[in-house]
Amino acid sequence: MTDAPGFPLFPHPHLLGIKGLSPADIELLLERADAAVAISRRPEKKLATLRGRTQINLFFEASTRTQSSFELAGKRLGADVMNMSVASSSTKKGETLLDTAMTLNAMRPDILVVRHSAAGAAALLAQKVGCSVVNAGDGAHEHPTQALLDALTIRRKKGSIAGLVVAICGDVLHSRVARSNILLLNALGARVRVIAPSTLLPSGIGQMGVEPFTKMGEGLAGADVVMMLRLQRERMAGTFVPSVREYFRFFGLDAEKLKAAKEDALVMHPGPMNRGVEIASEVADGPQSVIQEQVEMGVAVRMAVMEALLDPRRNGDGA
């Protein structure tokens, strides 16, 4: 994977979303990530690929899993990684997102990893800074590296994504993970279903190329992959479900409901999980679960993305 000999040049300076990526772009990142998995599994994991490069993780929303994954990915590539704690930063004193970005830009980082509660925040920063920007989640808009790691997990287990039936279940309305996965899975030829109470399905969801269901049994029937989503209560302005108990009864994935899917169906969850709300422990920890594999694939995907964005050929420095 060092300097990725043999891989075509990734044609984009930033990763702001799955929207705008071609199937070939997606496949390129997945192939790079496959190579990163092998590196992450060997005793000596550290590369010098990004030695001398600076990565700043700028997280305005808390995320232990994603921030740690990006940090580890950068360190495995040899980058100097700085985690900016927003809780102790100037943003708490009234500094705007753009002010913060311009301050960081003056430090001349090579890559900025951004998570923010506002949709479009990463795209806005990409217009204002002189480095590559990776969207680590912007409001309910997109979370591209999550979709890529989910695709890598599926592909390594199933061989191909084309033709698979993937059921995305839960709070689709508020989920950036759902949006990015729908875009990616459709691009690679999967048949995508979404399952949720009608209150948690976006209006016009069918126009995104998915088949909507409001009953778990119908939506899970014959599914190859079941992707569960948590209730995004922090993004809910009103009451979308009667109660947690009622929600689990109808939309929580337990062993009985899972029987509707194929026997070898994969069970996925982007985390963090709410056991007993959207998924039962017997399923989350069961033989069909690939949730821990998703975490492993996350580091590999983020290594691949950052290496692709900082490819020396982009500046004419490489072959």
Curated annotation (Swiss-Prot):
GO terms for biological process: 'de novo' pyrimidine nucleobase biosynthetic process; 'de novo' UMP biosynthetic process; amino acid metabolic process. Carbamoyl phosphate binds at residues 65-66, 115, 143, 146, 271-272. GO terms for cellular component: cytosol. Gene3D superfamilies: Aspartate/ornithine carbamoyltransferase (3.40.50.1370). It catalyses: carbamoyl phosphate + L-aspartate = N-carbamoyl-L-aspartate + phosphate + H(+). It is an enzyme of class 2 (transferase). The keyword Cell membrane does not apply. Its EC number is 2.1.3.2. L-aspartate binds at residues 93, 176, 230. GO terms for molecular function: amino acid binding; aspartate carbamoyltransferase activity. Pathway: Pyrimidine metabolism; UMP biosynthesis via de novo pathway; (S)-dihydroorotate from bicarbonate: step 2/3. Keywords: Pyrimidine biosynthesis, Transferase. The keyword Transferase applies. PANTHER family: ASPARTATE CARBAMOYLTRANSFERASE (PTHR45753:SF6), ORNITHINE CARBAMOYLTRANSFERASE, MITOCHONDRIAL (PTHR45753). Catalyzes the condensation of carbamoyl phosphate and aspartate to form carbamoyl aspartate and inorganic phosphate, the committed step in the de novo pyrimidine nucleotide biosynthesis pathway. Heterododecamer (2C3:3R2) of six catalytic PyrB chains organized as two trimers (C3), and six regulatory PyrI chains organized as three dimers (R2). Belongs to the aspartate/ornithine carbamoyltransferase superfamily. ATCase family. This is Aspartate carbamoyltransferase catalytic subunit. The lineage of its organism: Bacteria, Pseudomonadati, Pseudomonadota, Alphaproteobacteria, Hyphomicrobiales.
